[in-house]
Amino acid sequence: MKLVKLSVVTMLIAGMASCSFAADTLADAFKNGKVSGELKVWYFDKDTEKLNSSTSPTSVLKDTAKSGDILNTTVVLNYVTDAFYGFKLGTTIQANAAPFVDEEGKEAYKDDMYGSGAVLSEAYLGYTLGKTNAKIGRQFISTPIVNGSGSRIVKESFEGATIVNTDLPATTLMAGYIDKFQGRTSTGMGETDGNAPTFEKRAIFLGVSASTTYKFDDAYTAAVINKSIPNLTLTGQYAWAGDVNSGINTKDVDIYYTEANYVLPLNGFKLGFDANYRGSKTDLISGTGVNVIGYDGTQTAGRISISELAGFGAAFTAATTSSDDAVIAGMGNGASSYTATLVKASSPSLRANTDSYRFDFTYDFSKVGVDGLKTILQYGLANQDRVKSATTSADYISYAAGVSYAVPALKGLSLELQYEKQEIETTRYSNNTKFTADLDELRFKANYKF
């Protein structure tokens, strides 16, 4: 933390030396600040089956701990001061309630939706000098491998420091320090069920788990984005997290990410070509015996897409992971893989010895006069071969659909409906038997931004 404290002093000195500022006084900076917010009403419902044993299954039964429904109502309020000598203060509070949830819903969604109360998710000091922007404190971060997800009612956040510079032509440089993480609920942060999350020195390491946070010491990251070549975007990022505790052992974790995105404009439509190579370097493990899982793995992925074809779009994505080890995609649930599905996301595709595929079909109804209405159909596969001497492996098949509507008559209001059915076929190698369990989840989201 000495580094962060020194950075604050440096920013203060630099700010006072600058003659460029928006507000004349500190009082004006607060008076001229901007307030924005969002009202959310979300309803989730899921029905889940499971095997009676994860290592020696003999039958499929209903997973009562992961079946139920929940209605959440949330208020998000954001306030950012006007600039004063280049400085700004920013805050965001998320207040959530689940007024009608029953015991079944509480249990089913305790990790990601059931957490009543409020959390100050952003509370930062920002400073801008030329083309350099810095933030210290609690803040939302969205980079390929440090990324707080907003797919649940409470958005994930980080506490630390970030700096972004765009002085180099067509290039963005970013560096960051992560001290703490805020998840989705108190349960997800390792605390008592049913409350709002807090900031703790534990985080989601996606690929190990999407719901359980693990203790860590500190984390650092650096990234570069370059757009020097027309229609081509190149991205690279590295992150290091110290003393990550999986419950089995405690090890440092290195995570790296590279990506190339190329868009080819043609007459009446666009073609997209995307490639991604990512990996994690660590001795961290989970599980025991022949079912131990290592995370010293890689994933290679590619995507071909067509868009803006009279409102239609389509994409085919494929990815493969290393044969012996799974991959840690990053910190936070926003660090998703290319073949993440609409509702159930990335976890199946990050396992060791897994080939995953996804097909997307989209349509924008504004092309036929219905502004704001969009749809998506999705089909996904994540097929896993046996890893070393593991007792089981599993194949996932996903069918998903979504419709979203930005209501033109009321600016700021949007509605979204998502559904996914996932079939999980588990092979038990001791007697070469197969068992299929289903998972169905429906999500409705109504949001009003002001």
Language-model regions: role of each:
Residues 53-57, 106-109, 153-154, 190-196, ...:
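Flexible, surface-exposed loop regions and adjacent strand-edge segments
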Residues 130-134, 152-322, 327, 379, ...:
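Signature for the C-terminal beta-barrel architecture of outer-membrane proteins
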Residues 98-114, 168, 175, 180, ...:
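Outer-membrane pore/translocation modules
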Residues 60-65, 108-111, 146-149, 191, ...:
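Extracellular loop and loop/strand-boundary signature of outer-membrane beta-barrel proteins
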Residues 66-72, 113-122, 151-156, 213-217, ...:
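Transmembrane beta-barrel outer-membrane domains
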Residues 2-141, 164-166, 362-366, 375-377, ...:
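Beta-barrel outer-membrane channel/assembly domains of diderm bacteria
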Residues 57-58, 138-143, 202-203, 228-235, ...:
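Flexible, solvent-exposed coil segments and beta strand-coil junctions
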Residues 312-404:
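C-terminal structural cap/anchor segments
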